[in-house]
Regions:
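Structural motif
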Residues: 36-38, 64, 157-161, 184
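Proline-aspartate-enriched helix->loop->beta-strand connector
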Residues: 150, 154-164, 180
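N-terminal nucleotide/polyanion-binding subdomain common to many enzyme families
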Residues: 1-83
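A charged, well-structured terminal subsegment
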Residues: 212-228
Length: 228
């Protein structure tokens, strides 16, 4: 199943996780660099107010729901129960189901902490994944130098975790120069992924309450994203 719904007048692609996994494996097997945006409420708000930015994000091959809050008017619980992509955590499902397990990933992040957490998360999702490199992005960084650094590693997957707005503009501006097969942007919703990397306190572990703790952490992350 692959359809779309209007959220704040933006077309959001809707598909099952099975279809998503199939598409990602297809993207990783062709020679074109495909761009996947996991959308946040902030991204959609910005696109509503800035036509030029809207034109930028509409260049993406897929705009997927990056957080469940986007689908609050579309019975998100039913969609999730039906195996639909409802947040950026489906990227983890994709990594788990890579046809070629030793794909390489290069990470561009906002901070060294987030880069390290994303590296840990990616390897947990797919132990066979090769971490080809990473960089903490600086707006003053020379674009040509960064692009050369990425291209020297020729990653299969370019995972981008930057601020909403600059992230999408940077990707689309430099898309023709990048040597990768798949670019996945998660900057506006990365907290949903990083929440899974927060280790439970010792007292929680002793009481064997890790699943409940992880659920509460995820819910708190969603609330923060909605309030933002």
């Amino acid at each position: 199943m692959h359809a779309s719904v209007k959220v704040l007048d933006i077309d959001i692609d809707m598909m099952t996780n099975d279809v998503f996994v199939q598409k990602m494996n297809e993207y990783l097997s062709d020679d074109k660099l495909d761009v996947i945006l996991f959308a946040s409420t902030e991204l959609l708000d910005k696109a509503m107010g800035e036509e030029s930015y809207r034109e930028v994000i509409e260049q993406a091959d897929l705009i997927l729901p990056g957080e469940e809050a986007l689908l609050s008017a579309h019975h998100v619980e039913v969609l999730e129960a039906g195996g639909m992509v409802v947040s950026c955590k489906s990227f983890g499902i994709m990594l788990e189901n890579l046809q070629k397990k030793d794909q390489s990933v290069y990470i561009i992040g906002k901070s060294s902490t987030e880069v390290e957490q994303l590296e840990t998360w990616c390897k947990r999702m797919q132990p066979g994944l090769r971490l080809s490199g990473s960089v903490v992005y600086d707006p003053d960084m020379e674009a040509a130098a960064l692009i050369n650094e990425i291209n020297n590693h020729t990653p299969d997957i370019l995972l981008v975790d930057l601020e909403t707005g600059p992230q999408e503009i940077w990707i689309m501006e430099h898309l023709p120069l990048l040597h990768a097969r798949l670019c996945v942007a998660i900057g506006g919703v990365v907290s949903l992924i990083l929440a899974e990397e927060k280790e439970a306190p010792e007292w929680v572990k002793k009481l064997h309450l890790e699943p409940l703790y992880e659920k509460l952490v995820r819910q708190q992350s969603v609330k923060k994203d909605v309030q933002a």
